[in-house]
């Protein structure tokens, strides 16, 4: 594993407290509000003309939950993140044509959301561990691109 035992403990301890639906919806909504041009990937999700549309779009909330649940799978596979995300990397590259830079952006937003939802537990050490995790997830999702 690229993570120390201490980093793994920090990640697992915080992740056990995460509300995936709330944090996932928040993270994806933030991505689409901060970077509105990213909405083009989700045009089939319906109305997203305004930030309020994004915040109240059930499909965005559901997909955010799905995305964060997938991120949570990385937590369960800290020793093989790349192998675990091989299929998703291929899918996002071949079918969805998602710019792999989005994986880094969303990873950073997930970290912000986790910090907001868990301010007490989100110490600098925990932040560093999750930053490392987000980097590994983004790299794993980008494998097919290079």
From Swiss-Prot:
Record-level Gene Ontology MF annotations: haptoglobin binding; heme binding; metal ion binding; organic acid binding; oxygen binding; oxygen carrier activity; peroxidase activity
Bilayer-spanning residue ranges: none
Binding residues annotated for heme b, in chain numbering: 63, 92
Keywords: Heme, Iron, Metal-binding, Oxygen transport, Transport
PROSITE patterns, A to Z: GLOBIN
Matches recorded under InterPro entries: Globin, Globin-like_sf, Globin/Proto, Hemoglobin_b, Hemoglobin_oxygen_transport
One BP term from GO: hydrogen peroxide catabolic process
Top-rank lineage group of the source organism: Eukaryota
CDD domains on file: Hb-beta-like
Tissue expression: Red blood cells.
Domain Globin: 2-146
Example of a GO cellular component annotation carried by this entry: blood microparticle
UniProt miscellaneous comment: Displays a pronounced Bohr effect despite the lack of the His at position 146 conserved in the beta subunit in most other vertebrates. Shows chloride-dependent sensitivity to organophosphates like ATP and 2,3-diphosphoglycerate (DPG) but not to inositol hexaphosphate (IHP). Binds molecular CO(2), not bicarbonate as reported for other crocodilians.
PANTHER family on file: HEMOGLOBIN FAMILY MEMBER (PTHR11442), HEMOGLOBIN SUBUNIT EPSILON (PTHR11442:SF7)
Assembly notes: Heterotetramer of two alpha chains and two beta chains. When oxygenated in vitro, exists virtually only in polymeric form. When deoxygenated, forms tetramers, octamers and larger polymers.
Family stated for the protein in its record: Belongs to the globin family.
Function, in words: Involved in oxygen transport from the lung to the various peripheral tissues.
Full protein name: Hemoglobin subunit beta
Organism field: Paleosuchus palpebrosus (Cuvier's smooth-fronted caiman)
